[in-house]
Regions:
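Non-catalytic, polymerase-adjacent accessory regions of viral genome-replication enzymes
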Residues: 1-40
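Reverse-transcriptase-like RNA-dependent polymerase core
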Residues: 10-11, 42-65, 78, 85, ...
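Short, conserved non-catalytic motifs in the polymerase core
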Residues: 21-29, 54-80, 94-106, 126, ...
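Conserved polymerase palm-domain catalytic core
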Residues: 38, 44-46, 97-98, 103, ...
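PAPS/PAP-binding and catalytic site of the sulfotransferase fold
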Residues: 82-86, 142
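Short helix-capping/linker segments at secondary-structure and domain boundaries
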Residues: 88-94
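A short, well-structured juxtamembrane/interface segment
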Residues: 108-112
């Protein structure tokens, strides 16, 4: 049900998830000043399918190496959390047990502890960073996976908006 998926209550949950660890950021603070009206505006835009991702924030980090980061504005991050809340339970059922990246109650430290139990104590491992990982994801293949496993036109629409959004076309340098 579209009104349920994009409801104020679901957006409020997504907002609370999104602001964890982000409350001190400028875009989060601006959003929080009028968060109820911002969420109502988002609800209306999503239900009417008038939602458009806003500007991104572009900045460089140097640790562990120099790299360019394209971050979504806080308002768009709320929408991302809304979409993840719908997709996550579907993907969780398909993942193998020993897949640890970006999963609730898992993560790199838990993966290392598990690996230490499974193999010899003289353990070596590699933690790698794939250059331009998110930029090189095949967006059409990703969207096809969603279409294959999700039977909800509203989710298709929102996923397409987010996946095919190009942050380099509308950004604020920082």
């Amino acid at each position: 049900n579209v009104s349920m998926m994009f409801s104020f209550q679901n957006l409020l949950k997504a907002y609370y998830q999104c602001r964890k660890g982000k409350r001190k950021t400028t875009s989060a603070a601006k959003f929080e000043i009028n968060f109820e009206s911002e969420l109502l505006k988002l609800e209306k835009e999503l239900i009417s399918r008038n939602y458009q991702p806003g500007h991104s924030i572009c900045f460089a980090i140097t640790d562990p190496k120099l790299r360019e980061v394209w971050a979504a504005d806080f308002r768009d991050r709320v929408v991302h959390h809304l979409l993840v809340s719908y997709l996550e339970p579907i993907w969780e059922k398909m993942f193998v047990f020993h897949s640890y990246a970006c999963r609730q109650t898992k993560g790199a430290h838990k993966a290392i502890r598990c690996l230490k139990k499974i193999i010899a104590p003289d353990l070596f491992f590699l933690q790698a960073d794939i250059q331009s990982f998110f930029v090189t994801i095949d967006k059409s293949a990703l969207f096809s996976l969603i279409k294959k496993h999700v039977n909800n036109p509203e989710i298709f629409w929102l996923a397409e908006k987010i996946i095919f959004h190009d942050p380099t076309t509308n950004y604020i340098p920082r």
